[in-house]
């Protein structure tokens, strides 16, 4: 399987990639290659977008949908993030946080 970055026209063979992670700055997807090198592959506007792009790549790898995965653009990720349901906030003990209003 290959991953492709439209903006830079970079293509990487996943057989040459040891790991994929959010870069140091927090707004990029970086690749750790089997040769020991690290390459910044794609830059995004936020860490949340970078994490979502990695999640999309992981889903594609898991399902084995295609031979080439094109890294999503920021606009596509923003739409996907906005459509996600809000997470329910729970206290560290696992209980819901108590609301202090209403009747």
Labelled PLM ranges:
Residues 1-103:
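Eukaryotic intrinsically disordered, low-complexity regulatory linkers and tails enriched in Ser/Thr/Pro
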